[in-house]
A protein has these predicted regions:
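Active-site/ligand-binding-proximal alpha/beta "capping" segment
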Residues: 98-108
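Conserved N-terminal beta1-alpha1 strand-loop-helix module at the mouth
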Residues: 1-66, 71-98
Length: 108
């Protein structure tokens, strides 16, 4: 449905799935995104992104560092990082992240 509606950047996020379950989901999503010419990003799990052949990974503050993920995935993969404060945003600017997501900076 998202792909039919024109979405071209998809993030697979399932915090409850096992590595095997997430890999299965990633493979299914990858097949669909490839057919649609869309990009697939895996949330948190560099290992799953690498094994599935996804386009990249989105990292949280408690995940591997951007530098570690870049070393594993290589220069051609997309790496994004979440930030939740001005200090985290500034730190993310100093990395090789391809994009920076800004989460709640102020109380919500």
């Amino acid at each position: 449905m998202l792909l039919n509606g024109g979405a071209r950047f998809i993030q697979l996020r399932d915090k409850e799935a096992s590595a095997r379950e997430l890999l299965d989901q990633a493979m299914t999503c990858l097949e669909l995104t490839r057919k649609a010419g869309a990009t697939l990003i895996i949330n948190d799990r560099v290992d799953v992104a690498l094994t599935a052949g996804a386009d990249g990974v989105h990292l949280g503050q408690d995940d591997l560092s951007v530098a570690e993920a870049r070393e594993i995935l290589g220069a051609d993969k997309i790496i994004g990082v979440s930030t939740h404060s001005i200090a985290q945003f500034r730190a993310a600017l100093e990395t090789t992240a391809d994009y920076i997501a800004v989460g709640p900076v102020y109380p919500t």
